[in-house]
């Protein structure tokens, strides 16, 4: 299992991917649209592990949640 912290802004989705011991696996960003999320999930598939993510509740978080869950991620929306 890998763990992703997601930070959504109007222009991009930043992510920090951690392993089970808390070590950084990958850090990056993606456009916050359907094509960007598709590219992000395809990019992170190469790690070969399920991903559990958290994203702050804000405009666009539900869209991110739904798209990433369709790609097989487990996503939680956190209230700030």
PLM regions and their residue ranges:
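Phosphate- and other anionic-substrate recognition elements at nucleic-acid/protein interfaces
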Residues: 1-80
């Amino acid at each position: 299992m890998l763990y992703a912290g997601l930070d959504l802004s109007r222009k991009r989705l930043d992510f920090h991917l951690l392993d089970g011991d808390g070590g950084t696996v990958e850090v990056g960003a993606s456009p916050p649209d359907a094509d960007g999320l598709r590219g992000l999930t395809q990019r992170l598939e190469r790690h070969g592990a399920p991903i559990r993510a958290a994203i702050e509740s804000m405009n666009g978080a539900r869209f991110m949640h739904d798209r990433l869950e369709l790609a097989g991620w487990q996503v939680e929306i956190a209230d700030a």
